[in-house]
């Protein structure tokens, strides 16, 4: 799969300014746990940096995040993500500089992308505590 085909499936990767590599951001509005924790005082999600703050509030950023979000169940998502990450020749990749894991299928697909990108160190901070039970 070439990069143009991959981007047609997953949209482009994001490039957070404070990270040494690329990332894959989805809308903070769609966080399963974060949506609940946003209303809890002193929770880490209460003042979420990706929830309508900074560049995350711009329409073009939100549109890109929703394109990525809608792509998560595409049958070729894993292949497309691996192609894009491998093409960047980076050492590090961050999952969800905005957004979070949606469900077990999403988590398993991320693990498969990691398997297909062995030269890259993946980082996935999450508030979805259940994911710890499914480490590969």
In which residue ranges do the predicted regions lie?
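Class I S-adenosyl-L-methionine
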Residues: 1-136
